[in-house]
Design a protein with these regions (language model features):
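Extended catalytic-interface subdomain
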Residues: 313, 340-361, 371
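C-terminal recognition in membrane/secretory proteostasis and scaffolding
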Residues: 349, 359-626
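Non-catalytic architectural context of zinc metalloproteases
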Residues: 29, 42, 52-56, 71, ...
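Solvent-exposed coil/turn segments that connect beta secondary-structure elements
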Residues: 69, 112, 123-125, 170-172, ...
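Gram-negative bacterial Sec-dependent N-terminal signal peptides
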Residues: 1-21
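Intrinsic-disorder/low-complexity, polar/charged segments enriched in Ser/Thr/Lys/Arg/Asp/Glu/Gln
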Residues: 34-36, 48-52, 61-63, 106, ...
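Juxtacatalytic substrate-recognition/specificity segment
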Residues: 53, 213-338, 344, 348
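Early extracytoplasmic/domain-onset interaction patches
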Residues: 24-69
């Protein structure tokens, strides 16, 4: 780098420091007064939320922040680009504002002398199509997330800002949220005051078709709030509700404490509202297919979502990594311990689905087989990346599409973490002659102080210390070798009395998914996945399809001279098994049609778990209801 360039950069840095320093760091002091947020959510046609925010103000410079780092997303995903029409008034008079060029979530205002109140009005232009983001408003329902409709004062911990929210809903709509209602006048609902931290943590579902079910009574009740595109989707059978109630019971038996005063499952059964699974302390945002209840046997693969998000009330909300426990929504989050936050929650989500009866044990095993196969054959990226490194993905990638996800890897702290915790369970059992297990870790780490829901952060050393309290071992090395290494993550399968095998029969999960959309999951044979249209949705790095030059986005038009269908390509794979004749594909690449030959002769391969004779079946013990 030449000297003039160095000087220029030094000057730029010097000039930028005052601007960047204008946003006051949050302080643990009370905010005087109440932040009021009033939302008009009636413009369904345009999908616009109209917002009026009112707060006390004192003369001088003031900074308003739009939430940037969103809990549960673990990343700076606050949709600032969808804030529009901002007008700020002080004592009724419009005052100019400027955006901090180095912190685009910060708005600067000079409050005039003698002023006492500031009003900020704006519109949140929610996505009109999935190409713009997650759809949050439809003719039948809406999802109001308060972080999208809030500006708040800089310089304070979010928990020290008292806030009160209200919303005007479409005529006659019902709603559900963890917040307590102060009053409803017509279609305007005003909620009781709450800390701003908890307000953002208390989103709302509202809609035309709604059903509320009590899953657990008592001083800390749990409710299932179901919204749907059509009334018929609300028709749940008693045994289906019983399985959801059993989920609550099984969580109680695991942790022995509830860290909420009440809990609200928010569940949207929809093809219109954008899909979601997002945790909160006293609620969760969930979505499922319209046939969630009405075609119970066909919708089972998505039923672990509620178990996953409910578990987060303990793991992720009550307790979370210390680097995630930030003072407000504009301080960067650290994601280093997501392999516990998300990884163990992924583990418990599937285990609790089995224990509660939301899944059968066979369904749980087949789902686990799919995860294990990923880390045996389907994650070539493990050769160069670690699970620990993927904890940077929320900030680095923000779930943007990837050309080769299995090689680039993406948020593997979920499923990779799940596999590690399965191995931890088997190790705890081995160390204690099957007297202690991961259940004991769960209760010790998350099951204290019933009724308290202030954040209780944890560190890596806390995890190790608690594991040692269950069974003494070199847990630090164990955890670090799995999260920082490039070796196998599936040791917990055989340690629990099962082995991973492949055969030509699709497992239950694959059968269910393929029966819904006629897609073809050929990852462990041709090394690709296909949509019913013939479009390639994924290609396994260095697999047969990859080595034949195929990529995501190509379209298979014909197989061995026959028009493409899922059945046709599966028949071709079966016919080529044990022969020397390649499979011939006609492939559309942009505006070209090419013939591609894949020299693969291994037949169809799908993952399954198979019992190891003579070895104790610890997996069935893990899945058994308590």
């Amino acid at each position: 780098m030449n000297v003039p360039t160095v000087l220029s950069l030094s000057l730029l840095a010097a000039l930028s420091l005052p601007a960047a320093a204008q946003t006051a760091a949050p302080q643990d002091v009370p905010f005087e007064g109440t932040l009021k947020i009033d939302v008009d959510a009636t413009d369904l046609q345009h999908r616009i939320f109209k917002v009026k925010t009112t707060m006390p103000a004192t003369p001088g410079p003031m900074t308003l922040l739009y939430p940037q780092w969103i809990p549960g997303n673990h990343s700076p995903t606050g949709p600032i680009d969808k804030l529009a029409g901002l007008v700020i008034k002080v004592d009724g008079k419009v005052v100019p504002w400027t955006r901090d060029q180095f912190d685009v979530y910060a708005f600067k205002v000079d409050v005039p002398q003698g002023a006492s109140e500031l009003v900020a009005e704006f519109k949140f232009l929610s996505p009109q199509a999935s190409s713009q983001g997650r759809v949050m408003m439809t003719p039948e329902m809406l999802n109001l997330q308060w972080n999208t409709t809030a500006l708040y004062p800089a310089g304070y911990f979010a928990r020290n800002i008292k806030a009160q929210a209200s919303v005007t809903l479409p005529a006659g709509w019902s709603y559900a949220t963890a917040m307590e209602t102060e009053r409803r006048v017509g279609d305007t609902v005003t909620f009781k005051p709450i800390d701003f931290d908890d307000l953002v943590d208390s989103p709302m579902f509202a809609g035309k078709y709604y059903k509320r079910v009590e899953l657990s009574a008592g001083k800390q009740p749990v409710y299932l709030n179901v919204f749907a595109d059509e009334a018929k989707s609300l028709d749940a059978k008693p045994e289906q509700i019983k399985a959801h109630a059993a989920l609550v019971q099984q969580m109680d038996k695991l942790y022995g404490a509830r860290h909420f005063d009440h809990y609200e499952f928010l569940l949207a059964l929809t093809k219109k509202l954008g899909g979601i699974g997002l945790e909160h302390h006293r609620s969760s945002e969930n979505s499922g297919a319209p046939n969630y209840f009405t075609e119970w046997d066909k919708s089972w693969t998505g039923r672990d979502l509620l178990a996953h998000e409910f578990n987060h009330s303990w793991n992720g909300k009550y307790r979370r990594g210390a680097d995630l426990a930030t003072p407000n929504f504009n301080v960067p989050m650290g994601d280093s311990l997501l392999w516990l936050y998300e990884g163990q929650t992924q583990f418990w989500g599937e285990v609790m689905s089995a224990r509660s009866g939301l899944w059968t044990q066979e369904q749980a095993r087949d789902m686990l087989a799919g995860v294990a196969a990923q880390y045996e054959r389907g994650r070539p990226g493990m050769a160069w990346r670690t699970v620990q490194d993927t904890t940077n993905d929320p900030t680095m990638s923000m779930r943007r599409p990837k050309a080769y996800r299995n090689y680039q890897m993406s948020e593997d702290y979920y499923s990779g973490g799940q596999m590690m915790w399965l191995e931890v369970d088997s190790k705890l059992r081995a160390l204690t002659n099957n007297k202690r297990s991961i259940d004991d870790f769960g209760k010790a780490f998350f099951g204290m102080k019933n009724g308290e829901w202030d954040v209780n952060p944890y560190t890596f050393d806390d995890i190790v210390s608690t594991l040692n309290g269950v069974a003494a071992f070199d847990w630090a090395s164990f955890l670090r070798s799995r999260m920082d290494g490039h070796g196998s993550l599936i040791g917990g399968i055989e340690a629990n009395g099962w082995k991973l095998v492949y055969n030509d029969e699709p497992n239950l999960a694959t059968k269910t998914d393929e029966s819904d959309d006629k897609d073809a999951s050929l990852t462990y044979s041709l090394g690709m996945s296909l949509k019913a249209s013939g479009d390639i949705s994924d290609v396994l790095w260095d697999g047969p399809a990859f080595n034949a030059g195929l990529i995501t986005g190509n379209t298979i038009v014909a197989v061995n001279g026959r028009a493409f269908s899922s059945d046709v390509i599966k028949d071709a794979i079966t016919a080529a098994k044990g022969t020397t004749v390649p499979i011939e594909l006609l492939v559309k690449r942009l505006d070209r049609y090419d013939t591609v030959r894949i020299d693969y002769h291994g037949g169809l391969l799908y993952p399954h778990l198979e019992r190891i004779a003579g070895k104790p079946d610890r997996l069935s013990e893990l899945y058994k209801a308590r």
